């Protein structure tokens, strides 16, 4: 089985500043989350070969590269989500609701992918520690066997020379094993550092979800406030129309009364003039 680099999980396109508009960030985050899930599945597949005949330095190298690159991808997505939360809200209440739903779905998907990745990370760490323990035990057994042979076997000068050669070979093998153990211990330290990074991302994500809840409450409050203002404005318009209608009615009555009075005065003046 061949193991390639993690280029297939990196963001396509030229390098440069991250997109700043809402839709582009959403699209980039969605792609990152999908790549995190794919890489997690690949890490799980490589992990299953640890401690088997397929275990090798190449497998260790690819496993470390996959998990570290996936960790960087998770950190990048976390920063993009923070940037997403800092963007100004649209003026339309309907657009605010739509963006709110998109961010909720995105954070849920990211949380799920991140959780699966961390579970696999911890399992890899456990298997690596078991592998180191077995290697150390094997090195100790080799040293004990060599000491036992030195105590039980008597030999002449020729045999002594062969024994010295054998001991040198065993010492070389043991040194190689110890070097491999050191490499795996270094890999475990990096893995545990990456696990701590993921823990911090979870904390940031929890804070963003909390802030998102506050934002949702604010949006709903603004919507309710707008509805109240619309209702009040409607009531005021109805009252204004009522008062205007009532005022017109009074004006009509007043004009009619004045017309009657003027008519009476004209008649009186006309009669008096005769």
Curated annotation (Swiss-Prot):
Q: Which domain of life is it from?
A: Eukaryota
Membrane-side (Cytoplasmic) residue stretches:
2-250
Q: Which SUPFAM superfamilies match?
A: t-snare proteins (SSF47661)
Major site of localization recorded for this protein: membrane
**Where does this one sit in the cell?**
Endosome membrane; Golgi apparatus membrane; Endomembrane system; Early endosome membrane
Query: Where are the residues of the annotated region Disordered?
Result: 1-20, 128-150
Free-text tissue specificity from the UniProt record: Ubiquitous. Highly expressed in brain.
Q: Name one GO cellular component term.
A: postsynaptic recycling endosome
Record-level Gene Ontology MF annotations: SNAP receptor activity; SNARE binding
Recorded topology in the membrane: Single-pass type IV membrane protein
- Briefly state the protein's biological role: SNARE promoting fusion of transport vesicles with target membranes. Together with SNARE STX6, promotes movement of vesicles from endosomes to the cell membrane, and may therefore function in the endocytic recycling pathway. Through complex formation with GRIP1, GRIA2 and NSG1 controls the intracellular fate of AMPAR and the endosomal sorting of the GRIA2 subunit toward recycling and membrane targeting.
Subunit relationships: Associates with the BLOC-1 complex. Interacts with BLOC1S6. Interacts with NAPA and SNAP23. Identified in a complex containing STX6, STX12, VAMP4 and VTI1A. Interacts with GRIPAP1. Forms a complex with GRIP1, GRIA2 and NSG1; controls the intracellular fate of AMPAR and the endosomal sorting of the GRIA2 subunit toward recycling and membrane targeting. Interacts with NSG1. Interacts with TPC1. Interacts (via N-terminus) with VPS13B.
Protein name from the UniProt record:
Syntaxin-12
Q: What is the source species?
A: Rattus norvegicus (Rat)
Lineage of producing organism:
Eukaryota, Metazoa, Chordata, Craniata, Vertebrata
